[in-house]
Amino acid sequence: MKKSNFVFFSGGSPNHLYDSIHDSDFSTELHDVEKRGIIAGCSAGAMIMGEKMIKGVGLNYLPNTIVIPHYGESFYSWISSTVKLLNRGKYKLLCLEKDTYFIKDGDQLSVLGKQNVHIIYKKEHHTFTDGDTID
């Protein structure tokens, strides 16, 4: 891993991913990978990028943020509704629709994909599409 420039986390259980990674040599090395390359994830792999998850904490690559994948998909709609109620404005919600991604470069996020990324914070709801940047 010392020469890796790309790490991808797939879906599954976000809590299992976090428990397997945090406070490990792998976690320490991830920060070095971030400096020289890309850390990516989908579904649960995206959820662990935030500071907080629906249950538990994340890896904090996005401070003050909860990442919600599958946003708008009917099966997962209860998750985003529940998080909005529980959140009460403490964290930003970064909600990803299907086939849509964000790229973090420093403090800026760029949107890439077929659908939208939503940032929900308190009573504000902003929608971003392919090519948009988020400060």
Where do the protein language model's features map onto the residues?
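A short, aliphatic-rich alpha-helical micro-motif
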Residues: 1-2, 34
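C-terminal and late-domain segments of enzyme folds
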Residues: 6, 53, 57-135
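Short, basic, helix/turn surface patches
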Residues: 12-16, 122-125
